[in-house]
């Protein structure tokens, strides 16, 4: 790749950086989950979807996650490998009362083919949204070519949304 840049590096010296007032990150789960893009990865069938569901419900309720406070707000869980019945069954397993501030969706557009607009529309309708979970990433990718370049491109789109 030949990306010649005709300008010098833009740097900041240590003193200037230390003197610059910067905003701390906003945490959805205090000290654990900051605003932004995160990837939950692990072996198949170890409970990642259960964890995602529990996290969506717990944050929507404003309850602590492992003794860490949460920023209560609307959550959106794109559970793209599940049916509504499966989600309901799992909800009954983890809680007696799911709040109306946790939303579930089993179908959505792909990255670059409408997903960004769908999420933006949801966020506009629910401005207090603090967490969006996509389960699984592969279900929203338009190309099933797992090259680094495609990974980077797709994750960059999601990072801009975050």
Whereabouts are the PLM-identified features?
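N-terminal nucleic-acid engagement/recognition segments and initiation subdomains in replication
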Residues: 1-4
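Conserved inter-motif catalytic segment of the P-loop NTP-binding fold
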Residues: 6-9, 15, 22-24, 28-29, ...
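Pre-Walker A (P-loop) beta-loop-beta motif of ABC nucleotide-binding domains
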Residues: 28, 34-35
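Hydrophobic anchor at the beta1->P-loop junction of P-loop NTPases
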Residues: 40
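P-loop (Walker A) phosphate-binding loop of NTP-binding proteins
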Residues: 43
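Active-site catalytic microenvironments for nucleophilic, acid-base chemistry
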Residues: 58-62
């Amino acid at each position: 790749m030949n990306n010649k840049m005709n300008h010098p590096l833009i740097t900041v010296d240590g003193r200037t950086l230390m003197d610059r007032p910067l905003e701390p990150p906003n945490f959805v789960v205090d000290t654990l989950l900051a605003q932004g893009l995160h990837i939950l990865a692990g072996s198949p069938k170890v409970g990642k979807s259960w964890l995602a569901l529990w996290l969506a419900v717990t944050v929507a309720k404003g309850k602590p996650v492992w003794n860490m406070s949460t920023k209560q707000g609307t959550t959106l869980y794109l559970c793209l490998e599940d049916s509504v019945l499966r989600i309901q069954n799992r909800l009954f397993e983890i809680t007696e009362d799911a709040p109306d501030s946790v939303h579930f969706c089993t179908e959505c557009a792909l990255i670059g083919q409408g997903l960004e607009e769908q999420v933006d529309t949801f966020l506009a309708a629910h401005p207090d949204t603090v967490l969006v979970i996509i389960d699984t990433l592969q279900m929203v990718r338009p190309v099933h070519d797992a090259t680094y370049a495609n990974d980077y491109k797709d994750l960059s789109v999601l990072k801009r949304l975050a």
